Amino acid sequence: MKIILKDVYHENLNYLKNKISNKHHQDLLLQKPGINHYCLLSYLSKKINNSLIVELGTYAGTSALALSANPTNIIETYDLSGDPYSIINTPSNIKRNIGNIFDLNDEKKLLQAKLIFLDTAHNGDFENQVLKYLNKNSYKGILLIDDIYWNGKMYYFWSAIKNRKIDLTFIAHGDGDGPNGNISGTGIVDFNNIIDIDDSNVKKRVSTMTKIFYLKLKYFFKSIFIKNKFKN
């Protein structure tokens, strides 16, 4: 799968606006900071066809909506509870599920999915449970992880991943939409070495790369005092 990063910026999400019930979530989808995150989801959905995409962490459904951009794919999205400001016109290729995917005994769907989008508790525990399950069962698809710099636990989890991984923070979630205006980060885990990244003609902003550097430094010093439990 060839991912041409400059093409991510060309994704037009305006047609999705009428599927969202309130202005707050319209702004999440269509305005900075954060729009490049949804552009990336929409772009990735169009790179695969007739496939299952699993999202872990629905919230209002804006990410699921972006993932549904390719109508040939089925999106199974999971969250522990519904959101009162959810999408009102849910596309027919999105199926919403309430509950932990493991508690619902739906975890085999992870192995069937070509793409998994992981955006859950940001404490590293559930994220690590998913990663261990995928490795144990020889998953061959792609895992997209949201907010890899959200906090120290997420960064330790991301850093401990031994599979091939690609940091895409400079293209998505590098606009200061994390805690206290920091970047929150995006990463891809490529379990079968199927991704070819073309980052030509993409300017890596000095401000974003500088923030990444200082966050890594901050979390490194914190890790001296915190035992890293994310081993896979």
Across the structure, where does each feature detected by a protein language model lie?
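A short alpha-helical cap/connector motif
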Residues: 1-117, 121-144, 148-232
